[in-house]
Amino acid sequence: MVGVGTDVHPFQTGRPLFLAGLEWPDEVGLSGHSDGDVAAHAACDALFSACALGDLGSQFGTSDPRWRGASGVALLTEAAQRVRAAGYEIGNIAIQIIGNRPKFAPRRHEAEKVLSAAVGAPVSCAATTTDGLGFTGRGEGIAAVATALCVRVR
């Protein structure tokens, strides 16, 4: 089963930036009920989509205070556990981050290691810009798209 997930958050001054499981010092953070980690959130959505388990909002809704301020890594770890509990194994997740900053390439391998450990399966990350187009191009926020491959095992 293949699932696709997306997430988008605007920048919010006064918050730390968490992206792809990493904290990015000296960067403006993203708004959100949790830590705003668009890469981790898109990966969660992709997992839930692949296994027909709803989406990030239905699994970790803003009405549930347990998830307020939660890290994207914690959400992704929990998402992977729920997918396995539903009878699926995770093959891999691929994440594409869309935004002008931070410069992702220098920390890509570090992010992949953290996210792979959270999922218990390979996670690859890439980043791109929109060449000045749209809200990410204007530097107003960051978006991410993820694809997950899951296999029913029971």
UniProtKB/Swiss-Prot annotation:
GO BP: isopentenyl diphosphate biosynthetic process, methylerythritol 4-phosphate pathway; terpenoid biosynthetic process
Coiled coil: none
EC number(s) stated in the UniProt entry for this protein: 4.6.1.12
Superkingdom field: Bacteria
Record: residues binding 4-CDP-2-C-methyl-D-erythritol 2-phosphate: D7, V8, H9, H33, S34, D55, L56, G57, T128, T129, T130, D131, F135, R138
PROSITE patterns in UniProt: ISPF
Binding residues for a divalent metal cation: D7, H9, H41
Record field: catalytic activity: 4-CDP-2-C-methyl-D-erythritol 2-phosphate = 2-C-methyl-D-erythritol 2,4-cyclic diphosphate + CMP
Cofactor(s) in the UniProt record: a divalent metal cation
Bound cofactor: record note: Binds 1 divalent metal cation per subunit.
The keyword Lyase belongs to this UniProt entry's keyword annotation: yes
Listed pathway(s): Isoprenoid biosynthesis; isopentenyl diphosphate biosynthesis via DXP pathway; isopentenyl diphosphate from 1-deoxy-D-xylulose 5-phosphate: step 4/6
InterPro entries tied to this protein: MECDP_synthase, MECDP_synthase_CS, MECDP_synthase_sf
Main enzyme class: lyase
An annotated Gene Ontology molecular function: metal ion binding
Function recorded in the entry: Involved in the biosynthesis of isopentenyl diphosphate (IPP) and dimethylallyl diphosphate (DMAPP), two major building blocks of isoprenoid compounds. Catalyzes the conversion of 4-diphosphocytidyl-2-C-methyl-D-erythritol 2-phosphate (CDP-ME2P) to 2-C-methyl-D-erythritol 2,4-cyclodiphosphate (ME-CPP) with a corresponding release of cytidine 5-monophosphate (CMP).
Family: Belongs to the IspF family.
Protein name (record): 2-C-methyl-D-erythritol 2,4-cyclodiphosphate synthase
Species of the source: Thermobifida fusca (strain YX)
